[in-house]
Amino acid sequence: MSFFQSSKWSLIAGGITAPSGFKASGVSAGLKPSKKLDLALLVTSPNAQCSGTFTQSFVRAKCINLCLERLSKTAGKVRAVLVNSGHANACTGNRGIDDSLIATRALAEKLDLLEEEVLICSTGVIGEPIPMQKLLKGLDPLVMNLSKEGGSDAAKAILTTDLIEKEIAIEGYLGDRLIRIGGMAKGSGMIHPNMATMLGFLTCDAGLPKDVWDAMIDRVVDCSFNAISVDGDTSTNDSFLAFAQGDILDSQHFNELEIGLKLVSTYLAQSIVRDGEGANCLFEVKVKGTSKIAHAQIIARQICSSCLVKTAIHGCDPNWGRILSAAGSTGIPFSLDEVSIWIGSFQVMSNGQPVEFNRKLVIRYMKEIIKGNNASDEKLIISLVVGRSEIEAIAWGCDLSSEYIHINADYTT
């Protein structure tokens, strides 16, 4: 994978359970009509430190509140995460929190843990409660199947409309210690996070102080999961949980570890966009020249979220006016006279003026990316310069097709 060619980190097998100190499982509890895997469990060693980021939507599932409460109560010392897919358990009234409490209490008893050491994440159709009898019946096989090799089943069990599993693991030496990082995620539609991904989980076998780990995860999430958009909609259940366990890492290696965490998180975030409902093309937007990094991020993310930009990419239409219009709609000030735009290596605007370009070549470039026939890159690149500074931000999106409409028009019918 070219993603890691310049990194000291190497890809390995194992996914979320590749780091030491973690076990996982995934089973079919009958929560989905398809009988596919729908219940996942991740269990950590006693000394693990958990950091979580969650949806910023005012409409959110009760399991989010429970996770926040327990992370605060335990100072991040949680031991297990239960994930059910197919039912979001959001907007279900008091039953939502009651069911979350019942599920985590039952699991805590089976794992011989305290209730507050168990978290729950739910994903699926909003307004649908969890079929609790099926979930509770599925806990015994879920616990029984816990293993070091269970990461792949867990990655499958958290999926909903996803077409592919999203998991990864890497390893690298930090000093004389071999450190491993694993991750898994789910997401395909309702993707426009304002803190994390739809559901994402990360593990690491290097210990860090709580304040260091929390700050590190905030930065990692901001430049990965917060930088993607499939359809501009933020979920009620967005959750990202990151676990660090093991001997405390020497502080001189913190930066190197953060690079590894960003690699894993960026890979998972891009996988979500690549698997966007009905999507054919992953595209990357680079924005440079703003006075603040936050301004560059806002512009890049707005372009990625624009339906007009997304449909133009789907149709292989090099309509740079849509790119510029999306950038201008953010409220971030910049001088039009300093704006230059590239689609791939083709410049289409320079210092606020249109540039004559070979339209056929640009269209061919766009078609090659969509069909996977471009030898140099697997994603379409849009570059925008809006000023003279070296500040730069990147975001990722996918094209918007008629298939997306079909998938979501029929989602609950």
From Swiss-Prot:
Location in or out of the cell: Cytoplasm
| Pathway terms, separated by semicolons | Amino-acid biosynthesis; L-arginine biosynthesis; L-ornithine and N-acetyl-L-glutamate from L-glutamate and N(2)-acetyl-L-ornithine (cyclic): step 1/1; Amino-acid biosynthesis; L-arginine biosynthesis; N(2)-acetyl-L-ornithine from L-glutamate: step 1/4
The molecular function GO annotations come to: glutamate N-acetyltransferase activity; L-glutamate N-acetyltransferase activity
Active site as annotated: T197
Q: Which PANTHER family match?
A: ARGININE BIOSYNTHESIS BIFUNCTIONAL PROTEIN ARGJ, ARGININE BIOSYNTHESIS BIFUNCTIONAL PROTEIN ARGJ, MITOCHONDRIAL
Q: How does it assemble?
A: Heterotetramer of two alpha and two beta chains.
Sequence similarity: Belongs to the ArgJ family.
Q: What is this protein called?
A: Arginine biosynthesis bifunctional protein ArgJ
Q: Which organism is it from?
A: Prochlorococcus marinus (strain SARG / CCMP1375 / SS120)
Name of the coding gene: argJ
